């Protein structure tokens, strides 16, 4: 099992030429994706889901959750299990985390991934990650996993493959961005397949 952290070759990763109008581009993209998901869900489309930040307290029905406190999910494959991971668990996943398209990366820079090239369930690598906790960055420092990742993974079951859209607010904390090498204000797009749940074996 291996997780690949793809490091930038230079400081160009934060160059405005690489990521022009990055804040506005990312905010507009997530807003459009959220709107699309809401429209699809209202029409009965089961391929789209929206989840509020798991760290928010219990809310009454009159509370309006801010757009940037939600993650959007597009279901690529549904598993048949019923158990969901808890915040204290760890999980075995195959995944890729990428940014929106930029000047050099037309498909978005994949800055964390367990496989190279196209998705292949038979050959993909995998890694054990905490549901809530930290990981080692490509600069060998510990960084907290995004709340958006933790929010989505707790809603999955084994066999699910989801594309998860995480707004910058629920992405990596400002203190972690430099360690990972991604620019601020980045929407993160995860392709996650949940392979196994390890109850109460959280990796911190």
Locate the predicted segments by residue.
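Sec-dependent bacterial lipoprotein signal peptides
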Residues: 1-10
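Cross-family detector of peptidyl-prolyl cis-trans isomerase
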Residues: 9-204
